[in-house]
C-alpha cells in the first residue's frame, strides 16, 4: 500500500507540473508583461513662466510617482518623458515632435499650459489625433468641438 501511495503522489505531482507548464504557454504574454501608459511632460521650468512652471511640473511628476508607488492605475504603471519648452512656441513644437511616441506608445493627450504653444501645435495635433488639453487658455474657438474636435477645453472661454 505504501508503494501505491508513493507512485500515486509522484504521478499526481508530475501531472500538476506538466499542467502548470502547459497553462503558462496558453496565457497571453501581456498577462506577464507590465502594462504602462505614457504621458508627455512639456514643461516650462525655465523662461518667463518658470515661477509657476517649476511647481506645476514638479507636482505633476510627483503625482505620477505617487500613483506608481501605489500600484499604478488598476495595475497600469505611468511612464513619462519631460521636455523643456521655456514657454516658447518653437520649442513647444520641437517637444511635441520629440514626445509624440515612446517605446511604440503614442501619446493620447498633450498639455502646453499656454496659448503660444497651443497655437503652435493645434493643427499638427488634429492631424495626429492627439487631444490638446487646455485649461482656460488657447484659442477661443477651441471651446467649440465642431471647429476643433481634438481640443478639450476644461474651462470654457
List the model feature ranges, each with a label.
Residues 81-82, 86-107:
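Short, well-structured alpha-helical segments in soluble
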Residues 39, 57-64, 93-97, 110, ...:
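Extracytoplasmic/secreted envelope proteins and their assembly/folding machinery
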Residues 34, 58-80:
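Signal peptide-proximal N-terminal region
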Amino acid at each position: 500500500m505504501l508503494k501505491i501511495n508513493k507512485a500515486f503522489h509522484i504521478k499526481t505531482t508530475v501531472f500538476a507540473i506538466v499542467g502548470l507548464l502547459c497553462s503558462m504557454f496558453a496565457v497571453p504574454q501581456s498577462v506577464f508583461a507590465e502594462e504602462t501608459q505614457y504621458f508627455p511632460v512639456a514643461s516650462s521650468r525655465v523662461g518667463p513662466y518658470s515661477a509657476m512652471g517649476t511647481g506645476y511640473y514638479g507636482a505633476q511628476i510627483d503625482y505620477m510617482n505617487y500613483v506608481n508607488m501605489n500600484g499604478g492605475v488598476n495595475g497600469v504603471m505611468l511612464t513619462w518623458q519631460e521636455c523643456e519648452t521655456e514657454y516658447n512656441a518653437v520649442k513647444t513644437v520641437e517637444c511635441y515632435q520629440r514626445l509624440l511616441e515612446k517605446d511604440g506608445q503614442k501619446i493620447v493627450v498633450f498639455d502646453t499650459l499656454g496659448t503660444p504653444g497651443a497655437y503652435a501645435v493645434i493643427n499638427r495635433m488634429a492631424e495626429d489625433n492627439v487631444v490638446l488639453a487646455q485649461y482656460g487658455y488657447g484659442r477661443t474657438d477651441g471651446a467649440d468641438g465642431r471647429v476643433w474636435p481634438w481640443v478639450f477645453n476644461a474651462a470654457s472661454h
